[in-house]
Amino acid sequence: MGRTLENKQQIVEELKQLLGEAEMALVLDYKGLSIKEMSDLRGRLAANGICKVTKNTLMRRAIDGNDTWSDLDPLLTGTNAFVLVKGDVGGAVKAVQSFQKDSKKSELKGGLFEGRLLSQNDIKAIGDLPSKEGLMAQIAGSINAVATKLAVGVNEVPSGLARALQQHADSENS
């Protein structure tokens, strides 16, 4: 039995709400994936987003008139699962890439981030970036290194002067 018009409208509204909260959308060809594998993907994405399987026509209606997501339209062909990411974009991309590596069945068609259509290479580059916490640790380490070098440099001036005076005094005594 097909879906009723009211049911379809409800799905479109839910998609619009999810897209409103999302920062990134990935389009994944899920052909050949079992229910267990889809559940695995959803579990991996739980912290950073959701995986939604819906008809392309319903997604097309959800993005219609929305400038942020309208560029997704060319990707809406075939059997698609939509990964809607909020929060840690890099973490979600890494979760999808890890899932693809493990399942070897799905293909990432592309995605959309900040109104820009992403190719597979763009998505791979995002996945290769360190996490937000990793970047913050690198920045903190760099700032700490500068402070340490400054402290050593400031401390070295009087020490160097003292060594030079001591050397001069030793040479005078000899």
Curated annotation (Swiss-Prot):
Keywords: Ribonucleoprotein, Ribosomal protein, RNA-binding, rRNA-binding. It holds the Pfam family Ribosomal_L10. The keyword ATP-binding does not apply. One of its GO terms (molecular function) is large ribosomal subunit rRNA binding. GO terms for biological process: translation. The keyword Hydrolase does not apply. One of its GO terms (cellular component) is ribosome. Disulfide bonds: none annotated. Coiled coil: none annotated. InterPro entries: Ribosomal_uL10, Ribosomal_uL10-like_sf, Ribosomal_uL10_bac, Ribosomal_uL10_bac_type. Belongs to the universal ribosomal protein uL10 family. PANTHER family: 39S RIBOSOMAL PROTEIN L10, MITOCHONDRIAL. Forms part of the ribosomal stalk, playing a central role in the interaction of the ribosome with GTP-bound translation factors. Part of the ribosomal stalk of the 50S ribosomal subunit. The N-terminus interacts with L11 and the large rRNA to form the base of the stalk. The C-terminus forms an elongated spine to which L12 dimers bind in a sequential fashion forming a multimeric L10(L12)X complex. NCBIfam families: PRK00099.1-1. This is Large ribosomal subunit protein uL10. It comes from Synechococcus sp. (strain RCC307).
